[in-house]
Amino acid sequence: MLFLASVVVALLAGPDPAIGAIPSSLQSILKNTHGSTDYGYPTDLTRDLLPIPVHSHNDYWRDEPFYTGLSHGCTSTEADVWLFNGTLYVGHDESALTESRTLESLYINPILDVLKRQNPESLFVSSPTKNGVWDTVPDQTLYFFIDVKTSGPETFKAVIAALEPLRERGYLTTVKDGKNVTNGPVTVIGTGETPFDMVAPIKDRDYFFDAPLADLNDPKYADVTGVISPVASTDFQEAVGKITVDTDPILSDDQLKALRDQIATANERGIGARYWNTPYFPIRARNLVWRTLLREGVILLNADDLAAVASYF
């Protein structure tokens, strides 16, 4: 009884401030080692980040494009590009464009900067490394969807040229002889108005095509494999159907069959599946759709609320 009484008194008194506190001696060590060359970690920019299979939808809308998605572990990002007077500007529509928001300033240079940090010069490597943006999983590629908004051929030609800084350092996933794929830190996928015939017939390239997931059985796309389209995408509500309930199972039998058929067709050809225009509200319905898509094997979840999807994992 005496022991029990002492426990009750201790609980009522609240937690001991000393419990869990860092001893002053250790605090001193931590303070003195901060910034020390002995303790410095060369590739520490993303060392605590774990990549998750999430596409940062409309990424350019975020306060810090690319970096926000990176900080949440998103393995895929997106830029809508508009070609005016030889420059690729980034924005959802023309009224959102500014002279300073370009593909180079918001994506190419930031991605290049992160990759340089993850691949520092070192006495301990005999040749330049090709680590990806995540220190925790350096062989994980970053999918970079470039959504062409203006004239397809002219704009995509400018996109190919804009990739040169990444290309010259060997940071892009490449195709050789139309069949041999070499994975790189960044996998560029043209979408939107990207011309299919500027990708599919090209035997040696470092860019890919976002095939229409729901139309892979169309004769036009009969020969499309992962060599052309590592990821195929489609509108969830058009291809699967609108969500009218927020109970589990979230999909009807017909909707689930459509989903499985589309994913199976893609997977048989080495293509990953992605659905956009998934529900964002009610939250329960959104989460049930996410769970279903992951269970059925999509390669990327399309997400607007990155904090929510990161906490989901």
Residue ranges and their predicted role:
Residues 14-51, 60, 68-75, 82-313:
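Catalytic cores of phosphodiester-bond hydrolases, prominently lipid phosphodiesterases
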Residues 1-21:
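Fungal secretory targeting signals
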